[in-house]
Amino acid sequence: DQDCLPGWSFYEGHCYKVFDVKKTWEDAEKFCTEQMSGGHLVSFHSSEEVDFMIKLASPILKFDLVWIGLSNFWRDCHWGWSDGVKLDYKAWSDKPNCYVAKTVDPQWLHRDCSRTYKFVCKSRVPR
């Protein structure tokens, strides 16, 4: 839809895909960058975008947790999205290293970056 690759879903100028495979945060982020130019773990910039991800992920993953691009993985104590977009919308519960989002409600939880979770990739629509 809207020029996304087959299997990807369009929302507000970006393409999204849920991956039903577990990886560490770093491996999931690397995987997303390899899927599509400009790809990263999903970042959120509105509650509507979170709702879109929940609608996309919950039928595939049921109740689960997915890695999102929020971390301080590369920036000591500086929080930011892995796609470089500034942190303008927050829904977190606490504050350590990497974050997962629930697939059933708009809540983010911190988890050790070395744990493995399923994930959602996001990319700009390819030109």
Swiss-Prot record:
Q: What GO molecular-function term can you cite, just one?
A: toxin activity
Q: Which residues form the C-type lectin domain?
A: 11-122
Q: What is its main location?
A: secreted
What's one Pfam family here? Answer: Lectin_C
Could you list the residue ranges forming a coiled coil in this record? Answer: none
User: Where expressed (tissue)?
Assistant: Expressed by the venom gland.
Q: Name one GO cellular component term.
A: extracellular region
- Keywords (A to Z) from UniProt: Disulfide bond, Hemostasis impairing toxin, Secreted, Toxin
Tell me the compartments it is located in: Secreted
Instruction: Please name every pair of cysteines joined by a disulfide bond in this record.
Output: 4-15, 32-121, 98-113
- Which Gene3D superfamilies does the protein's record reference? Mannose-Binding Protein A, subunit A
Subunit details? Heterodimer of subunits alpha and beta; disulfide-linked.
Q: Which family does it belong to?
A: Belongs to the snaclec family.
Q: Which PANTHER family match?
A: MANNOSE, PHOSPHOLIPASE, LECTIN RECEPTOR RELATED
What task does this protein carry out? Interferes with one step of hemostasis (modulation of platelet aggregation, or coagulation cascade, for example).
What's the protein called, per UniProt? Snaclec macrovipecetin subunit beta
